Amino acid sequence: SEPVVAQRYEALGQSYLPSPRPARVPQNARLSPADRGRIAMDEFARCVLVRSATGVGRALAEPMGEGQNRALARLATADCLLFGEMRFNPILFRRALFVELYRRRLEGDTHLPVVAGYSLAQATGDSPAIKVHWWLIDFADCVVAKDRPAAEQFVSSETLSNEENVTLQRITPVLGPCVTADVQVKLDRSTIKGALAEVLYRGVQPTAVAQGK
């Protein structure tokens, strides 16, 4: 799929910034490019959700694939970028939106979009990306079944925070037993957090199969 592009050209010293705060890629040289990207994506998703919760709900209601990717791309408003340009895979944007949605639910936000749940038994899709998606949902379903409180704490933790490190250590023992060998997926923090957030937000009930893993 084509990368989502958000771009904005502004003077750094501009006195007026729209609310919520637009995203900016941190310039801290001690952070890896991946970590800088995670922080910027978090801020971007947070801004987009506040500006267009209805649009986020509509995009996430689309079936996964090119249609949903186009809907996500339309949400990539320049108003949520302080300056410069961001290019990212729509799947990363999707995951960040679910993380922010679940964080806001935990904070008591009552104006969030409703995203329909689904059954893992009805997982469909032939493309590699969709197969990986369902593998991740099955994986996250298993993790939530084994330790839901730890999964919730990990999702709600701020990116690169000490809490994220601690909660990842807490949840690590249940990750291995939930991994199946049928799909090769890189399980980094962002991927794990996004999958857990989707399972938790959409209200998927942990399956008996997951509980038995």
Question: Where is each model-derived feature located?
Answer:
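Extended amphipathic alpha-helical interaction segments
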Residues: 94-160
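A cross-kingdom marker for long, charged
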Residues: 165-213
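N-terminal Sec/ER secretory leader and immediately downstream segment
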Residues: 2-100
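Functional cleft and adjacent loop/helix regions within the main domain
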Residues: 37, 92, 106-111, 208-211
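Extended intrinsically disordered, low-complexity coil regions enriched in Ser, Thr, Gly, Ala
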Residues: 49-73, 147-173, 179
